[in-house]
């Protein structure tokens, strides 16, 4: 599989645009005489969450002109890399909000770096679904694809310190694991209504898995061989919609519970950040809800980046935001 890199060391933060019921404020109507786009004011403000964010901090809109954003991770220089599935590229965003293309011809939703500094990405291009080493040039490698027993299509990934890759398969209701040697895969967790975002604790003893159609964020104990045990409810989501409607996935009446739970991130203190229905829900390492950062749109994924990893970037529904935090993202992993 070949990918075209057009910006060495860069990458864009891109989101797909979805239809919204009402026209965005300040956006000219279709067919207007002066179609120059004026970004809407979609900033929100944080509550005071001790140790996490000061009250009244702006959740600042960077852009709402993206196409399928997902999978943000921090690059070594502090800039942010994320996926733009609708545009089939990876995008980089610098500290000033400037976007640049990092890699083309890939429809990804999850990114990570292995201990060798290689970029791992899933690709959901029809007919090419798999998980690959995609960067640097010359190091490209297939880890799993549709010829691999047990693999169908992945949503999000996290790479452990040994180079193993955990990934969610929503349609198969399971979590897979690719060992550090990159040979094959195994299913390590099953019977999750709709697994979505995934991350690990700083010491990598706990695997966290979001269930976007369940009431609880799940936790598992990680074993030396990469398998997981002791499934448990880490916390009940701060907001759950109990409408029978299927929401944004599949036909109506498919699920009775919608948590909207999508991407996950952690900070250096072990707090867990969940992209939920009502914003970014922050939980203590023990699962206590500490507060929620409100957002103007539903967020799909998030990551800490910046020179000191104290900027929390949010992507989703065709837009990207950033918020300055009091805490630092976990420095030992890209996300």
What are these regions (language model features)?
Residues 2, 21-24:
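Generic N-terminal leader/processing signal
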Residues 9-19:
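Bacterial N-terminal signal peptides
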Residues 23-335:
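Sequence-structural signature of mature extracellular/luminal beta-sheet repeat domains
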Residues 1-11:
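Bacterial N-terminal signal peptides that target proteins for export
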